[in-house]
Amino acid sequence: MDPNPFIYCTCCDCCKLGQPKLIKTPYPLPKHPTGKFKPVLPPPISKEHNSLLSQPGKSTVSPRDKVQSGNTESSKAPSEVIQVSPGYTLIRNREQISVTLGDEMFNRKKHLESDVLSKVKFSRTDIISDLQEQIAELMAIIEQMNRDQQSALKLLSKDLDLRCSNMKQKFETESRELKETHREELERLENNYKEALKAEKALAEEKLDKMSKEYKYLKSMFHVFQDSIYEEMEDKWLRRKAEWEKDEKMEREKILLQQKCRIIKKFELQSEEKKKKMNESISAVSDNFAREKEELLRQHDEDILQIQELRKSKEILEAELRAQATVLETLNTNLFQCQKELERQKTIAANLEKLFQTKLAEAEEKHKYNIKTPTEENNCLRC
């Protein structure tokens, strides 16, 4: 007789990383002719087996359970020991759940079948509850991902709009400041030029007044000298009066013409110098304005490139969001398929439970019949 009767171990996924798995029992389930699995009950306990199980502290563990216990000891995972009933011990940790049956379990002959049924129901309910918990957690994760994506999209759109508005305001303020500075510089240069022109004009008028005063003074002195020597040289002057007047007139005109030419040349030179200075200042101002304009245009081009890059990044983010939306759709379809699979597993479990109950009833009737026939034979022999 096999010393390991009906040991069943269920591994649960405590970290919720995958579907829970069932470890096979030492007794394989033979196939029914209809294609379904037929549960195998433990064989009846004989006297020899009771004599072998006389020690109360021993527990029957399959080789697979020994390997699992060695793995748990090596990984040093914390385990929880639950005493379900006398002779029925449940050991649970993060990786698996193991069940140990002792001698006290085999002493209960009358309640053996009901205990087996309760174990099977317990394991099935554990599997169903684990699947339901996994589905609930998956739904919560999907909802959290949807909320995170919506909040991230809103934050990115707000940040992009804020950056665009800041850049536009900065460009407008800089262009306004440059226009104001340029206008102020032009006004300042015009005022300086007007003031310089007024000063030069006043200086020229002052020089002209001074020269006219000198000319009048010389003319008056000449008339006084002429009057003083008029009597002495009247005869000479009478003879040479015409020549002298003519020469005087020509000389005066010549002197006036020379002075006029000299003043005109001097004024032309000064005006040319002023024009050169004015042209140089205007060219310098125009060069500065051109450089500032080029810098502004270059900065405007850079701002346009930055705006284009931001638009590209926005398109990339929108593409990523669309990809994540497709992933969410696939997750929803997988969730729907898992729900359908869970319903199908529930129906299969209910059918297996019904089949197990019928087989158990048949086995009980057969066992009663097998007990009844020897008792009748014993009664007949006694009689």
Curated annotation (Swiss-Prot):
Isoform 1 is specific to germ cells of the testis and localizes to the principal piece of the sperm flagellum. Isoform 2 seems to be expressed mainly in somatic cells of the testis, and is not detected in mature spermatozoa (at protein level). Isoform 2 may also be expressed weakly in brain. Residues 125-220, 276-359 form a coiled coil. Residues 51-77 have a biased composition (Polar residues). GO terms for cellular component: cytoplasm; cytoplasmic vesicle; outer dense fiber; sperm fibrous sheath; sperm flagellum. The modification N6-acetyllysine is found at residue 354. This is Flagellum-associated coiled-coil domain-containing protein 1. Keywords: Acetylation, Cell projection, Cilium, Coiled coil, Cytoplasm, Flagellum. It comes from the Eukaryota. Residues 26-79 are annotated as: Disordered.
